[in-house]
């Protein structure tokens, strides 16, 4: 019961922080927006794969609420939040993260997220994710390929991610 209560509290806090955020005066509101990253999650522990499935479904919804000004070399970063789902069979977890995304240039970026993970069985724990990405479309709906590693502090739901990210 406490597990679901914490999920609702974390979700309410996340949504409340989004409602209260205002863009910095230097940032362009066109640079803000949502991202959806859908793909696969491959648990790193064999025991987890044997208890559920080898490959899990993975999806994240992110929102960037602040974008920095680019440096002379073109580097800039976003601050944001994300909520996701990773699961297959009877196993799953929901990560709720604050995110930092650094853009090295027009194509390459990296992302680090930290927050709370809510596994289907067990108590909530510290959750994290790191990703590398490559933008291969810069049109009206940018598309990127991402690879990374995500998990929770308990270590039973950690693994590799591969996904396609859409920005709108």
Residues covered by each model-derived region:
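Short glycine/proline- and aromatic-enriched beta-strand/turn motifs that initiate or cap beta-hairpins
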Residues: 22-84, 159-167
